Amino acid sequence: MLGRPKFVLASGSPRRLALLNQAGIEPDALRPADIDETPTRGELPRSCANRLARAKAEAALKSVQLDDDLRGAFVLAADTVVAVGRRILPKAELVDEASQCLRLLSGRNHRVYTAICLVTPKESFRQRLIETKVRFKRLNEDDIEAYVGSGEWRGKAGGYAVQGIAGTFVVKIVGSYTNIVGLPLYETISLLGGEGFPIRAGWLNAS
């Protein structure tokens, strides 16, 4: 990785890491931010995603500033919010939460918002918010019970993982697929490239 700036991913998400790897980018370090991700009272989905992505970036930056090997690195944070109308769905941890999410999503449209926040080596903050519309098929109780039993929903915004079994529930997607997974690749790479990060440096070894 010599010859390019250091890059830190402010996330412990295997999905976000895999998406970056898909684009030929291997972070020099992972700095997951331990923050309260509870929406504030009356907070709208867009505002929530933007606020949490910024908070994660700020927390990771503090860690990077204390590390001589990483000081001056690019820092990337992201937060994904699933919403039905103005209602923000939880990042389900309990069976009842997951079941409730799936019943709410059944047979209707919902929106997935991912906010990305990039801190440049000069410690400027750059943010973008990406929205994808998703429609689920009508789920019956057998679908819900079996999916909840799979456990793949745990910790996922909206109680599902589109890259897993829940992909079979999706009737239609309008917008970025990788946004639903947790990191909109096109917008992320465009943002990095626009701030001077050598986005093609890892392509030669990508295979």
Swiss-Prot record:
It catalyses: dTTP + H2O = dTMP + diphosphate + H(+); UTP + H2O = UMP + diphosphate + H(+). It is an enzyme of class 3 (hydrolase). GO terms for biological process: nucleotide metabolic process. Its EC number is 3.6.1.9. The active site is at D79. The record marks R15, T80, Q163 as: Important for substrate specificity. Keywords: Cytoplasm, Hydrolase, Nucleotide metabolism. It is found in: Cytoplasm. It holds the Pfam family Maf. Its cofactor is a divalent metal cation. SUPFAM superfamilies: ITPase-like (SSF52972). The keyword Ion transport does not apply. One of its GO terms (molecular function) is UTP diphosphatase activity. GO terms for cellular component: cytoplasm. Belongs to the Maf family. YhdE subfamily. Nucleoside triphosphate pyrophosphatase that hydrolyzes dTTP and UTP. May have a dual role in cell division arrest and in preventing the incorporation of modified nucleotides into cellular nucleic acids. This is dTTP/UTP pyrophosphatase.
